[in-house]
Amino acid sequence: MAECSTLESLIEMGFSPSRAEKALAATGNQGIEPAMDWLVEHEDDPDIDEPSVVVPEDSDSGTTDTQGMDTCEERLPLTEEEKEKQTKRMMELIAQKQKEREEREKRERIEQEKQRRKQGQELSAVKQKIQEQEMQKAVEDRRREKQEEKLARDRVREKIARDKAERARRFGGAGSEPISPPAEASIPATTPSPSSPVQEPPTKKEYDQCRIQVRLLDGSALSQTFRAREQLAAVRLYVELNWPGGAPGPFNLLTSFPRRVFTEEDMEKPLQELGLVPSAVLIVARK
């Protein structure tokens, strides 16, 4: 009778018959409170609504079951006070389990957030390391480029110095002074006869120096005097070394009239051969 009363009480409290039967079987029919505790604790079990397997008790006849059922049917319903008490107990258990579940979920969320932050910090560290490596590589590349540019300028300077030394050796260290012709006193003076006048052929004037003006990108200009036999590379080097604030990058040299863009091959040619003597205006243009 007690078992039947407990089962019906659980059903009256809103539990399904299958859950109520399973709770009583799991708690060994120890009463309504253990059954309610079990129901609240196993509320989220996936198999909570599956029918329980009931092992029939060994009995001499079926009369006992019939009597038990009759007894259940004859049981008086719970009083309002008993229902209220049991309902209150059930609500307290449900509230307690809900609180425990919320606390557990909160701890899980905190742990997940810790893991997320840890992974984010690790990812940020990896990204920062990659950026530092890329920056270091860029610095090394730029340092190597500057070193190569310096070596190239040094080679041009050395070549210019060798050319100057060679000219000094050839012309006896005359420097920028033009070669002096033999003194007129050493040539015997002869008076041409009126009948046979002497006509001297016109002589082409040779220039040993040339004045170069270079117009920069911003409209300003650089001016310098070079030897007529110096290479055009000397002019480019002069521009690179004297450009206010440094050259912004690779550039070409050209003349406007007649228009001519000088190539890398032209850089090895003397100014005299390029037609820039005795003076010329060169224009800087970006490559």
UniProtKB/Swiss-Prot annotation:
Stretches the record annotates as Disordered: 44-207
Cysteines engaged in disulfide bonds, as pairs: none
Basic and acidic residues composition bias: residue spans: 72-114, 129-169
Biased composition (Low complexity): 176-197
Coiled-coil regions listed: 72-164
Occurrences of domain UBA (ranges): 1-42
The UBX domain, residue ranges: 205-284
Keyword Transmembrane annotated: no
Predominant location: cytoplasm
Record's keyword terms, sorted: Coiled coil, Cytoplasm
InterPro entries: UBA, UBA-like_sf, UBA_UBXN1, Ubiquitin-like_domsf, UBX_dom
Locations listed in the record: Cytoplasm
PANTHER family for this protein: UBX DOMAIN-CONTAINING PROTEIN 1
Protein purpose: Component of a complex required to couple deglycosylation and proteasome-mediated degradation of misfolded proteins in the endoplasmic reticulum that are retrotranslocated in the cytosol. Involved in ubiquitin-proteasome systems.
Protein name: UBX domain-containing protein 1
Species assigned in the record: Xenopus tropicalis (Western clawed frog)
Higher taxonomy: Eukaryota, Metazoa, Chordata, Craniata, Vertebrata
